Regions:
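Hydrophobic, well-ordered beta-alpha structural blocks that scaffold small-molecule cofactor pockets
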Residues: 1-56, 160
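Phosphate-bearing ligand-interacting subdomains
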Residues: 37-96
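A generic structural signal for alpha->beta connector loops
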Residues: 25-27, 43, 84, 148, ...
Length: 196
């Protein structure tokens, strides 16, 4: 039985990590403005750039964006949504998503990440390896959480927020929209908006 076709937006570092997981389930190709058509990245062909999404829609119906820049990732998804693409979630086999959690569309959940009972994760979210989203926590649209960070019970991570590696967002703490939390931080309450 043949695999469904999937466009992967972005062939950079994060895009390649997404591709490793996506290839397990889909027949993948890249779209990337920085690579020539016909190039192969990790054995996956590049079929065009982002400007080619309208033409590629004739052959591909599914797209996942593996670009770490939250705002740019959102722009690509919005453009693709207007063209009629659908956005599956890419979930590593070793990740765990509770059947009682809510996961938006176009999310990437890498190895050993965990989304627990009652947690909610928005659209276009990237959860790196070892990330934990505890019960009743909420992660907004187009957020990015790096390796081994924990969002504790009842905590909220806003839209477009970026959480560095090895961070703890403590119980019922709030990370506002667009905030950048540096590596190794612990957030105990609502933080002022740090941006990069």
């Amino acid at each position: 039985m043949s695999k469904e076709k999937l466009l992967l937006g972005g062939a950079g570092g994060f895009g390649r990590m997404v591709a490793e997981q996506a290839m397990l389930q889909y027949d993948c190709v890249f779209v990337d403005d920085g690579q020539p058509v016909g190039a192969e990245i990790c054995g996956i062909p590049v079929v065009g750039g982002l400007a080619d999404l309208p033409e590629l829609r004739k052959e591909y119906g599914l797209l996942v964006v593996g670009i770490g820049n939250n705002r740019f990732r959102a722009q690509v998804y919005e453009k693709a949504k207007a063209l009629g693409y659908a956005f599956p979630n890419i979930i590593a086999p070793s990740a765990y998503i509770s059947p009682y959690a809510k996961l938006g569309c176009g999310c990437v959940v890498l190895q050993n990440a965990c989304v627990q009972n009652g947690a909610s994760v928005g659209n276009g979210v990237l959860l790196n390896a070892g990330t934990e989203i505890h019960c009743d926590a909420a992660v907004g649209d187009y957020a990015l959480i790096y390796t081994n960070s924990v969002v504790r019970t009842g905590a909220t991570v806003g839209n477009f927020a970026r959480i560095g590696s090895n961070c703890t967002i403590c119980n019922h703490a709030t990370v506002p929209d667009g905030t950048d939390i540096p590596d190794g931080s612990a957030v105990h309450s609502e933080v002022k908006q740090w941006t990069f």
